[in-house]
């Protein structure tokens, strides 16, 4: 495409042949005047080539970004290593667990990369590797694995797994099969089912994979790839050793031509083409003379060549095709074989003709040799039993069949049946009325699709509603019982279902009472446990108890009577622990009314681990792309989040002077641990408690001066604002302004347009599915705020008879603020703005977007309880990967087995953790990466590398107290420094310094609280006066779920070192999965939460400032 265009006038039109097809087409479109100016022509063509190259590079970049985000990073790696093009059929086989609609977006982008690779574009995608994840990009296929040492993706299945164990190293004297590297595996590795499935694809797309024991090939074998058995003639050595071009290497044209010539010697005659020149000699001889070009009718009927009409003298198919023959009988089986299905539909799809000129290597497509070498050939007597005479076969068609149309039902029956068994393939719709195989016997794999038994194929995709009327004469259902044992089978299946139901009720009894007991866990108060003494103090400390909460007063009332933001703390009698106000909002009635109640098959987003959520986001992006590309008219290669941004903001804005309005949600998470400021939560609570009956809430405007005063109150006192006696319309307008002033829309800049497209183009039947996928792709803080707002608006709609605010009315009022519609963007040029609004009325695009936003928000308000569930389809498609992403919480007995020491117990494991903490402190915590923090704290992290994407965080601070007092504050007085601390109890005391401890942390309403069950131990007799507290999650039978979600503490260690003058240095190392958050959220916010925690512990020791003048002592 980028051939040089002559610029000399003498060249004229003689250089037309040197142009690319695009250049020739452009040249022919020009008039004669333009053609007479070669210099002008050359400039036009050069500019066209440059623009085309830039467009192709952008498409390639978008495709690679999408591949990584959707769970296909291995293909992006191969493209960046200049190892494209690749075979699309092999990619489909690697992802055979995906639906056809989900594979199409992947194939579309791989075809784009194949096209870009054929154009020889420069591949210089320097992807900056950030610290957002401990692992490389996630791959959804279990046939690929990531090598941490080489930082590369490679195939799990190697090619040698296709061969029997005795043939993997080759026969004596033959050349053994060479090892394949990770870069070659995508082009040369095929598992056994993949080789078979290349030749068997159904028209419907859902059954595109054949069974492992079935390979529908009767055509002569053509070699399009290197042979893998030493008993076969070997291709030239340089073909085997030239799978790809190395990166940045440009092979010469002569080398490419010679390579193609060698490929031609290996390629047989295809179904639609022949070799040029019949007198060619020196080619690779595979077998004796054989029919290469069969009539189309022979291929369609799967006919078998019988020399001289004698079936007995005909050689087995393997021998006819030049494969080594074996003397095994049909009753013997190779160890590598799998049992074949008893039913198989005839393979009528003829073999495709694939081009051999593939850059960088070859794929083992159409290679039936692999299936044949691993199989024994049957004897002559079994061949006689295998094939019946063609005269004994009768093909039936329905009586109402119209000539020229495809029949709705076909039957191939034998006039002399020797079988008595019946079989039904429910997956393919094929009914076999054939013989029963002898146990241990099976048909050869190459002929598995040619069963000569009675067969009926019913096609449910043929137009017509009288299928059974058409096949009634064929099957005669009233006379013959086709399925004599079907009732017994169904009865047996129903019995198994009852057994499974009984078992599930015994294992999960809470599922029976889920509807009646919803909301009760987490609300029950703890019984007062016995007083627990610390061995280093000898006196009792405050007993475990439940802090005062809204639960003790009112559970179901919508009108909470608690004074906003003020709660009493129980005084422990210690000077620094005097009564402190708790400013964290506890909104239990809102939390209860919208507590998630998903079905057992549809888990909630808030219960997913970080690894599970990352996996679900890959499948959500894949499903959302498939839906949008099917319905939308936008770009087919990438979405708004995939477009490369050439202009980046160099300086991160500073939000120190802002507290509530105009601050990103993630900054609120870093400051307070919750994405919504406390004052905004209090505003929603005030509206929900006192103002839901106000007519036209969010529709009627408030007074600007009072709204401005409310904004100032929020900025000055973001933790506590009293909204009593405030106008409902003023507070509602202030809430709308909060969302309007966010730096980006609530639906984010990346996905706002996608949400609008869903309600513009996607059909109503698929909108919920598309919105669920898009919500999974939202940032965690945006998704949590969206859920809180939608649940609140749903409460407003429930009183529509009083406030007259329907879902559509609310959506019309709030959609512009949530989507940032009709707002002039800063990056828009003044000329564009002036042209757009010169007419004084919005254009049609703006009207469509406003309508889609209103309809979408109204739909989300009504479906707020279902939007945040994980679709069952995503969990089913992820297969074992979803289960493996769950964090296994060990029991006390399992902790000892994690150490290599014999006879190790959980005490040994805990002592091992304490010794490791002391060693790191002695080495000054080497290998940790420091990052910025606030409030005079030190923050650092370290990647673990155990397969979990979460990092290990470390926060340090100096405390004005000795180590023993600090340990007691962390161990027994958490309610003094953690405002989210709701409930706690000691489940079991193992010894004086070890216990099973359970506690609950509150979350922003209506999100569920987090329940923790940890094994913890503490030491006070360490060298240099140090104290430690180590804890981790364990499974305990007596620890019932008290909160909404059971969180997992993978590691939590407190190290308290004396600093002199009664001071200590507190270091907290933790790694916790709170559930419901993605790895990106932990990277952006969790470290700041750890730093804020140690700062609160430090601040709990600071004495209260007494009022009055300072006195001298």
From Swiss-Prot:
Bias type Polar residues, positions: 177-188, 536-549
Sites annotated Arginine finger: 699
Record's keyword annotation contains Mitochondrion: yes
Entry keyword annotation includes Cell membrane: no
UniProtKB keywords: Acetylation, Cytoplasm, GTPase activation, Lipid droplet, Membrane, Mitochondrion, Phosphoprotein, Tumor suppressor
Domain Rho-GAP: 663-868
Gene Ontology BP annotations: actin cytoskeleton organization; endothelial cell migration; endothelial tube lumen extension; negative regulation of cell migration involved in sprouting angiogenesis; negative regulation of sprouting angiogenesis; regulation of Rho protein signal transduction; regulation of small GTPase mediated signal transduction; signal transduction
Tissue expression: Ubiquitously expressed. Underexpressed in hepatocellular carcinoma cells and some breast cancer cell lines.
Quaternary structure and partners: Homodimer. Interacts with TAX1BP1.
Record's protein name: StAR-related lipid transfer protein 13
Annotated source species: Homo sapiens
